[in-house]
Amino acid sequence: MSSLKRFITNSTQPSSSIRQPNQKAVWLSAKSGTLLAMLLAIAGVFLCSSEVTHVQAKTGQTADAKSASAIDPDAVDAVKKMSAYLRTLKSFQITDNVTQDDVLDDGLIVQHESKVDYLTARPNRLRVEVTSDDQHRLYLYDGKNFTVWARLVNYYATVPAPPTIGELIGQADEKYNIELPLYDLYNWGTKDDDVNKIKTAVDVGPSAVEGVTCEHYAFHQEGVDWQIWIQLGEFPLPRRLVITTLTDDARPQHSDTLAWNLAPSFNDGAFAFDPPPDAKRVILEGEKADATEKGK
């Protein structure tokens, strides 16, 4: 299932009695913000909407995404421009400060924070490190092998990997049930893009994120509202995303605040894994399935 379809499906389903986010299995899960999943849908609107109604909300005006029920072409154009620019980046580093609302069964909202560090060298090197109060995970890809290390329990798994980041992301999700944070970033502008209908797109106006001047846009889709802050100037980078789930009365939010480095310094060692002392190697579920199939 594509990332956008997965997000929309999860967001529009009725809340369970526990009302907490669906987590993938055991210590290898990688739930983080699906930043680019939201943006893929917006870019798709430009292609599938033949008639567009112009609605703008500049500073000092009220931006009501729900009541407007229209699409601002400026907002769509901004995301289209951003997506094209992101596809030109060959290497980059991102620090993502994440906040996530968890809604407990009694309706109480508990907010969690995490930090995700990314280092990418296209087409075949990737390093992702996730740190929070209850987890510290490292994902490494060197073009040949994919390794996941759970630092707090000192477990790791290493499996053969395909030759590109895009293929790795698909394999990790489909075969090993591992969803890498911000994985849509690496599918941008490819055949794996999602196209979905957006009910409202609004240009809210200029705003600053961590001292960086951005343009603030708001979007509405059934079950989900989200906002994106895109850096102004020659580097149209996404700087912040806020996603609000509308199917829960508590309206829980997920936010990503991104700091970019477009000229990172690194060597091949950044993507290699040297098991620490006493580290225990474990077998992924996908590996077990392969072994069973070969044994038949």
Task: Walk through the language-model features, giving the residues of each.
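N-terminal secretory signal peptides that target proteins for export/translocation
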Residues: M1-A30
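Bacterial N-terminal signal peptides
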Residues: G33-C48
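Signal peptide processing junction and immediate N-terminal pro/mature segment
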Residues: G44-T62
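Gly/Pro-enriched, hydrophobic low-complexity segments
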Residues: V55, P73, N97, S132, ...
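N-terminal mature ectodomain segment of secretory-pathway/periplasmic proteins
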Residues: A63, A70-Y155
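Flexible, processing/modification-adjacent segments and terminal tails
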Residues: D64-K80, R87, W149-C214, F219, ...
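Well-ordered beta-strand positions in beta-sheet-rich domains
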Residues: E113-D117, L138, Y156-T158, Q227, ...
